[in-house]
Amino acid sequence: MGEDVRRIASQSRPRPSTWAVSRPRPASWRNSRGARPESWRVSRQSFREWIEHWEFEHENRDQILELGHELEHVPDLTVDVTPPATSDGPADSIEKSKEDGDADDKRQSASDSTVKGKAKAVDIGKQQTRDAPYSVHSVGRRRLIVLAASLAGFFSPLSASIYYPALPVIAHNFHVSNSQINLTVTTYLIIQGIAPMITAGFSDTAGRRPAYAICFIVYLAANLGLALQNDYAALMVLRCLQSAGSSGAIALANGVVSDIVTPQERGSFIAFASLGSILGPTLSPVIGGLITQYLDWHWIFWFLLIFTGTFCVPFFLFFPETCRKVVGDGSIVPPPINRSLTDYLRKRKRVKSGTEANQPATKRQKMVIPNPLSTLQVFAVKQTAMILIPSGIAFGTFYAVLTGASNTFKVIYGFNQLKVSLMYIPLGVGGIASALSTGKLVDRNFRRHAEKLGITVTRNKRQDLSDFPLERARLEVGLPLFYLGTACLVIYGWILEKQYSVWGPIILMLVMSWTLAAFFQVMNVLLVDTYPGRGATVTAAVNLVRCELGAAAAAVISPMTDGVGEGWAYTIVAMIGFATTPLLLFTAVNGIRWRREAAEKEKIKKAGREAKIEAEKRAREEIETKKEAKQKAEEDVEIGDLEKQDRKDSQRPTSSKAT
């Protein structure tokens, strides 16, 4: 490791005119070489403070910062830090550089660092990232975190479909047409696609917990208003507010997965993260039908209010902050606004035991105004767009079946509203089956490709996957499932057309739910792989495409079945989905090259941002220098005036005596 650190230091550019540090020399620095030491023996935490607050100017500064973070988790480790030759200590050398202004000293390169100890040496870069734990949470704890995030995303699709059975009753109570009451469904889906664009970018910078808090506060308030209102205009406005609050949590589930799970095991976790959004549309009509059958339709929203409140209490007490920009791998104590009860207990326990609490994040994140344009930028990336289009079409296919089932089973098989609601159970069973099976298939295929390439897959460790065929590994699982789902859709349509036994559609609905839901999950895994660290943002883009295409499919399926019949209507929908699959094949072939090109572009952008920051810093330093020079000149003038006045005052008594 020492050789790698020295190599990085040797690549550094000249030291700036002043070394910036935000605190004096830590007390844990110990002089081990006499009055003029060549190095100091420091603790792990002091080493991190040193590399964090001395502003190294070289391209590998982020790697050194990351090294300091990882050293905190290596036991029995000490660090020898070699300071500048003229230094009496880190803080002393800083002050000396400011006072002397020695040109040679200002150009001196950043100090070398060597690391020694009982810990196994690792390389900076690929080796270092491979050996570093990706998350401090155990496997069981990570599963609970993802399950909680999935349940939080369950409320949006639940609220979208739960009052479908009550639409005729609500229209009769408000004395409006069916078209007007259906407008509340359309507006809900539109807001459901837009709201995550705002919350996703906010959560990627400020943290997941503040974003969840805002979403659920809005959602609870909207449910309370909907349970109490009896006006069509209020229903329309509050449904939009309900959609904005609940749908914001959809994108956060995959963001949580990207925070704590590596690509090697991401398939299983994202399958569970998608479970809530899959079960919502399938189970909610059953719940809504039962409530409408035996209670007043207002109780739909009372049920949502009580259910959500019961969920939120343990969720906000124990759900930890996972955003890597705030807590890193989970070992850093987050700011107060991001802390759960367990964070407070952990910090209190560490203080009582005499252990210093974990350091705050390397750079405390500022609360930023949510920018929906950051989500729209996802569509500008070609590989992402080629994945989003087939994924959205597949979701539209699923919604076409979901929406058309209500009227189809009522007209063809003569079912009442309660029986129609029970027909959605096979869709829910298929969704559960996909969550239990898809992740294992995805992870197994990942390991198969890794074995072919001679790569050892390690759990909860970062690995360099720049040359790994991620697209091929994911799509080899997803595409066959999608083909099977579209084939079942064609058969489903013609069975309804010929009015065969109801058991045929029931079985096909279960298979379609399993295959299409599994395809959604595979696409989610691939998209999160494409945008590491921005899982919430890319999921918001996915949600936008799916909701809008789902709304379109829900709107056109009824006219299509009335015009050409169920057989040709669902055949056309299946053919549209099948026609988009060449985009995925093209992505599988060119995915590695596209990721490399994207990484190079990001590197250039990062260099440009750093150059801009450096230019702004130098400009501020010049302004401060001019300001200090001007202030000094004014002080000199003022001192000169005072000296003249003193001389005049001293001459006045002499003149009086002479007189």
Swiss-Prot record:
Keywords: Glycoprotein, Membrane, Transmembrane, Transmembrane helix, Transport. InterPro entries: MFS, MFS_dom, MFS_trans_sf. Residues 1-42, 76-127, 605-659 are annotated as: Disordered. One of its GO terms (molecular function) is transmembrane transporter activity. It holds the Pfam family MFS_1. Phomoidrides A and B (also known as CP-225,917 and CP-263,114) are potent inhibitors of Ras farnesyltransferase and squalene synthase. CP-225,917 and CP-263,114 inhibit Ras farnesyl transferase from rat brain with IC(50) values of 6 uM and 20 uoM, respectively. CP-225,917 inhibits squalene synthase with an IC(50) value of 43 uM and CP-263,114 with an IC(50) of 160 uM. It is a multi-pass membrane protein. Glycans are attached at N182, N338. GO terms for cellular component: plasma membrane. The chain crosses the membrane at residues 144-164, 183-203, 210-230, 235-257, 269-289, 299-319, 385-405, 422-442, 475-495, 502-522, 549-569, 572-592. Coiled coil: none annotated. PANTHER family: MAJOR FACILITATOR SUPERFAMILY, QUINIDINE RESISTANCE PROTEIN 1-RELATED. MFS-type transporter; part of the gene cluster that mediates the biosynthesis of the antihypercholesterolemic agents phomoidrides which are dimeric anhydrides. This is MFS-type transporter phiD. The lineage of its organism: Eukaryota, Fungi.
